[in-house]
Amino acid sequence: MEKRVARRGALRQKNVHEVKNHKFLARFFKQPTFCSHCKDFIWGFGKQGFQCQVCSLVVHKRCHEFVCFICPGADKGPDSDATNLHKFKLHSYGSPTFCDHCGSLLYGLLHQGLKCDSCDMNVHKRCEKNVPLLCGTDHTERRGRILIKGAVKGSKVLVEILEAKNLCPMDPNGLADPYVKVKLIPYDAHKLKLKTKTIKASLNPVWNESFTVDIGPEDNSKRLSLEVWDWDRTSRNDFMGSLSFGISELIKSPVEGWFKLLNQEEGEFYGVPVTDDITESIQEIKSKMHRSSISSEKRYPEPDKVQNMSKQDIVRASDFNFLTVLGKGSFGKVVLAERKGTDELYAIKILKKDVIIQDDDVECTMIEKRVLALPDKPPFLVQLHSCFQTMDRLYFVMEYVNGGDLMYRIQQEGKFKEPVAAFYAAEIAIGLFYLHTQGIVYRDLKLDNVMLDAEGHIKIADFGMCKENIMGDKTTRTFCGTPDYIAPEIVLYQPYGRSVDWWAYGVLLYEMLAGQPPFDGEDEEELFTSITDHNVSYPKALSREAVSLCKGLLTKTPAKRLGCGPNGERDIKDRAFFRPIQWERIELREVQPPYKPRIKSRKDVSNFDREFTSEAPNVTPTDKLFIMNLDQCEFSGFSYVNPEFVVTV
């Protein structure tokens, strides 16, 4: 073929911006589009944003340099690990919804897109192959980031506010006038207000200012709050983002680096570090989880038969001064007691043998003792000091948990903010995970049985309803539990396993978030009908992450219920509701609780119901004739002293 000279137009290579193997090009969007990094709308005319030519990720021009994951088109790191796969399923949306990857509308009437069962991510079917495998992690920065240093030295908190990047535009010119407020929360009006200078017309302000906040011992349960605000000359200043750190956490370890700015509710309880390379972060988390699983195997060995006490360790009722009734019920009563000759305080649960025999509860009592005596328990289960018996009674000597229970707190506050509920739910979950690994179904999880210690950490109490040896597919059929928390399979007399605990966990979580039970009825029959047949309605104030978690836990079919699958623990920890939760630190009690109970003195019982504490700790008489004819062998092996018990004075 003869070659000829022809006219051709000139070429110019487009300006490609490479970030973490993404190849971003400026682009004009013909339809409304949202940024996948900050979740804000992409405004303007012309080429308003950037789109990756490999994976189609869409971001603002100002956001592209902060994308923290490797482009899936070039992905060879931990983002490719199957353990971080999204669980996408076809979904029909009832209201306009935008793709969390490319930012454009999920169009159509039915099955418009895919929704992840675990993290609630919404994407187009065409985008699924390009989505990074980061299920359970949050790679977005909705309000920008701030660089700070914080430490406690003596009685002073030292804070350095250095700079911020990629803040939200707040003014008509697309910029903002940011400044930072520094304070302790809960806020004391008598303390000095501290704030930085205002940087005019900037989304990337540099302050480089230092502050000192005086603290006393009473401030250790408070949090250092940093809030970024936009200054306005004519109207109220606008909130831009915040974060906070527990003073007790800063005392243990200073903080330094970039942190995400959060909304007001989250910022009151969290300080989330920015991970510029989320790939490395995931690798580090996985190695920690691997080490944690190895250590947990050592920490939680198979339960063995407990050793009975030696003669020199014998504990008697005469060793204690009984002070105040803390609670009572059909089982007997719980009394605050002081060990004679010491400052040691204990909560002693006293049960009548005649009532136990008549109610056929001997085995339940022995199970409760064996569960309390399990070795190497996590710190979120009540500790047992010892068990002993007299001719007519059984005594459980346990640690005194003096912060009251969650029922008392809910009655005081009405309901909890979501970060508070997430903290309590995470600590409760650690306790349930342990019990389930031991083959124990708890069966009586409720607000009344979740106590708060002096620091504000939770303690699960009352193991009288537990069922042992429920491993794998093994089930039981006993009808038991507290009516409001009973799972549908118990109501329907179906065989069940640990699934009933996750149902009760869902009910408890709903009560913490909504301040009311999810099911109700005039009587038990109506209540049980509601549990088996009715759907739960959720307050509009709840976030979609909270609703998604509650729906997963309150699924009526046990096999489909969250937490009941082969990877139940991972499924719960990976939920979007728990994204800010650092599980490893939660397990080690390193996270400062959101609330510290008010305790006036060692023997203070003001956090317990006055109906009980006003009662004298008298021992009520038993049926002497019945006791004389009682076979005491029924309770052989009950007496026990815990060699692992740690005395706290």
From Swiss-Prot:
This is calcium-dependent, phospholipid-dependent, serine- and threonine-specific enzyme. Activation of PKC by serotonin results in presynaptic facilitation of depressed sensory-to-motor neuron synapses, which is thought to underlie behavioral dishabituation. PKC is activated by diacylglycerol which in turn phosphorylates a range of cellular proteins. PKC also serves as the receptor for phorbol esters, a class of tumor promoters. The gene is PRKC1. Binds 3 Ca(2+) ions per C2 domain. This is Calcium-dependent protein kinase C. A zinc finger (Phorbol-ester/DAG-type) spans 21-71, 85-135. ATP binds at residues 326-334, 349. Residues 579-649 form the AGC-kinase C-terminal domain. Ca(2+) 2 binds at residues 171, 230, 232, 238. Belongs to the protein kinase superfamily. AGC Ser/Thr protein kinase family. PKC subfamily.
